[in-house]
């Protein structure tokens, strides 16, 4: 009875158009991707530096009240839990109850007395080994 006829044929994208779009997306990913990853790596280094500064403030408060910095054996845990035999401890000296790991999932290193000051507090960076460059560089308190 009624017949609907199409005057225009439906068309999809041609193979050439799809290849051009994929090529443009690949170029964008190649140009923008490394820059985004660079900023993400820098953010982890900045986070480690801020955490080290927060630990440093807690260590200074510990020193003011107790009269010394925590020993290497007491470590950073002395900022959240009173070490045995310490009478003037009025902590916790950090907002968090647990000592966080560095942004790369490794423990911070603490040594007192330090080689570079009253104490040394540092992260070994992404590679978790001494030295390095860029995101692998050590983040230190001195």
Predicted features by range, described:
Residues 10-36:
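N-terminal single-pass transmembrane signal-anchor helix
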Residues 10, 42, 61-65:
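Conserved amphipathic alpha-helical interaction elements at protein-protein interfaces in regulatory
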Residues 8, 41, 48, 68-69:
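Alpha-helix initiation/capping motif
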Residues 35-54:
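Aliphatic-rich helix starts adjacent to a transmembrane/signal segment
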């Amino acid at each position: 009875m009624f017949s609907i006829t199409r005057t225009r044929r439906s068309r999809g994208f041609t193979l050439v158009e799809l290849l051009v779009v994929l090529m443009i997306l690949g170029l964008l990913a190649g140009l923008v991707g490394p820059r985004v990853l660079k900023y993400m790596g820098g953010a982890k280094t900045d986070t480690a530096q801020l955490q080290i500064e927060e630990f440093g403030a807690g260590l200074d408060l510990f020193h003011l009240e107790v009269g010394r910095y925590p020993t290497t054996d007491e470590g950073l845990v002395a900022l959240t839990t009173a070490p045995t035999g310490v009478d003037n401890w009025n902590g916790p000296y950090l907002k968090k109850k647990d000592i966080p790991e560095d942004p790369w999932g490794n423990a911070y290193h603490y040594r007192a007395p330090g080689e570079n000051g009253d104490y040394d507090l540092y992260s070994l960076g992404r590679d978790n080994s001494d030295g390095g460059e860029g995101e692998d560089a050590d983040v230190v308190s001195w």
